[in-house]
């Protein structure tokens, strides 16, 4: 899994 990709996905969901 790509941690950066997941972080970006989560950040996108939070915003």
Swiss-Prot record:
Expressed by the venom gland. GO terms for biological process: defense response to bacterium; innate immune response. GO terms for cellular component: extracellular region; membrane; other organism cell membrane. GO terms for molecular function: toxin activity. Keywords: Antibiotic, Antimicrobial, G-protein coupled receptor impairing toxin, Immunity, Innate immunity, Mast cell degranulation, Membrane, Secreted, Target cell membrane, Target membrane, Toxin, Transmembrane. It is found in: Secreted; Target cell membrane. It comes from the Eukaryota. Belongs to the MCD family. Eumenitin subfamily. Cationic linear alpha-helical antimicrobial peptide. It exhibits inhibitory activity against both Gram-positive and Gram-negative bacteria, and moderately stimulates degranulation from the rat peritoneal mast cells. Its mast cell degranulation activity may be related to the activation of G-protein coupled receptors in mast cells as well as interaction with other proteins located in cell endosomal membranes in the mast cells. Binds preferentially to charged lipid membranes as compared with zwitterionic ones. This is Eumenitin. It comes from Eumenes rubronotatus.
